[in-house]
Swiss-Prot record:
Listed name of the protein: Polistes-protonectin
GO biological process, one term: killing of cells of another organism
Residues annotated as signal peptide: none
Domain of life: Eukaryota
Keywords, alphabetical: Amidation, Cytolysis
Tissues of expression: Expressed by the venom gland.
Record keyword Magnesium present: no
Residues bearing PTM Leucine amide: L12
Keyword Chloroplast part of the UniProt annotation: no
Family according to the record: Belongs to the MCD family. Mastoparan subfamily.
TM spans (from-to): none
Annotated function: Shows high hemolytic activity (97% sheep erythrocytes lysis at 50 mM).
Organism: Polistes rothneyi
Length: 12
């Protein structure tokens, strides 16, 4: 879950 959030931030 946390890794998914980090991935989303990197996509920004």
């Amino acid at each position: 879950i946390l890794s998914a959030l980090l991935g989303l931030l990197k996509s920004l």
